Regions:
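N-terminal auxiliary segments of SAM/dcSAM-dependent transferases
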Residues: 2-44
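A short acidic, Gly/Pro-enriched loop at the edge of an enzyme's catalytic core
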Residues: 76, 137-148
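Hydrophobic beta-strand segment of the Class I
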Residues: 80, 149-150
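Conserved SAM/SAH-binding beta-strand->alpha-helix loop
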Residues: 110-112
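Conserved SAM-binding strand-loop segment of SAM-dependent methyltransferases
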Residues: 124-138
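Short, glycine-/aromatic-enriched active-site segment of Class I SAM-dependent methyltransferases
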Residues: 184-202
Length: 202
């Protein structure tokens, strides 16, 4: 493991992520220190024409920390992977941009989030997106498969960042793009693991 973290410690973090986000899958309102739902999408300057196409019930589950699409555009016909997709709002928006000749796949380790993402997808009627329960560190896709990989507020939660970035590089086509919106910690890192675990989501 990287960051001098043991496997048991990494497993504890994964369990805490599953616990928190299984609750977020029920209702993200009040779970974060920043705007969520349609207000979050608008505050982060997502394309109004796209977010207006989202049913309110889908938009309400947006809980990203930034706008990965502000980094670059998704072109029609491209194939996109969303790492740690949560409720799938960014995945769905990517599928809209890619159009019917493209595709979008969202992966997440939280089964409840995948179930929510699939429910959200059904409400949109989009048929060129799908979701899969898997970890970003073990992507079940061939080499050179995707044109774009996106991630929103998630890589910071993954203990083994070197491994997840290596996997992302593997599945990206040569010349592919990585578009990440995320947050970082400021100040000193807690030395005690239990204190680090308690502050993992702050």
């Amino acid at each position: 493991m990287t960051n001098n973290m043991t496997r048991d410690q990494a497993d504890k973090i994964a369990a805490s992520i599953r616990q928190k986000y299984s609750e977020v899958a029920k209702n993200p309102e009040g779970q974060f220190q920043y705007p969520t739902g349609r207000k979050g999408l608008e505050a982060l300057n997502y394309d109004k024409g796209l977010i207006d196409k989202l049913p309110d019930a889908v938009a309400s589950f947006y809980c990203g920390v930034g706008n990965p699409f502000s980094i670059g555009k998704i072109n029609p016909g491209e194939h996109i992977l969303d790492v740690s997709c949560g409720a799938g709002v960014d995945t769905i928006l990517a599928a809209m941009m890619a159009g019917p000749n493209g595709s979008a796949v969202g992966v997440d380790i939280v089964p409840e989030m995948i179930a929510r993402a699939e429910s959200n997808l059904k409400m949109t009627g989009i048929d060129h997106a799908r979701f899969q329960a898997t970890a970003g560190e073990n992507l079940p896709f061939p080499d050179d498969w995707f044109d774009v990989v996106i991630s929103n507020g998630a890589i910071n939660l993954i203990p083994d960042k070197e491994r997840v970035l290596t996997e992302i590089h593997r599945v990206l086509k040569p010349g592919g793009r990585l578009m990440v919106a995320d947050q970082i910690g400021a100040g000193s890192v807690q030395k005690d693991f239990e204190a680090r675990l308690a502050s993992w989501f702050q």
